[in-house]
Amino acid sequence: MICTNPDLVVDRGEKREFCAGSIAKVFEEIGGKVNYFGKPYPLVYNQAADVKGKKVLCIGDNLNTDIRGANLQNFSSLLILNGIHKNEADYSYEKLFEKYNVSVNYVQTILKW
């Protein structure tokens, strides 16, 4: 199996749904082999890493994938707080980052296009 989005869940509006990573996880648990692509795996960052003289900022709402991937590549990160971890608001930022063993450079409440 090829899993192009390792996230376990995704928020679509006000609804939280299982994501491709959940299917891949179950497939592995029953003995299947999964090749993962996407954050936090390095292949997705190759193009950004090859840009000389530029700074990279990884933006995402998932500490396990978006921010962990940035940390693994030594890129700066921006966590969007109204995403996957919004229900963990009882944590201070520092405790939340410690819980997931990540380092976050910047936080922002919401991201709109």
Predicted regions mapped to residue ranges:
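Asp-based, Mg2+/Mn2+-dependent phosphohydrolase catalytic module
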Residues: 1-113
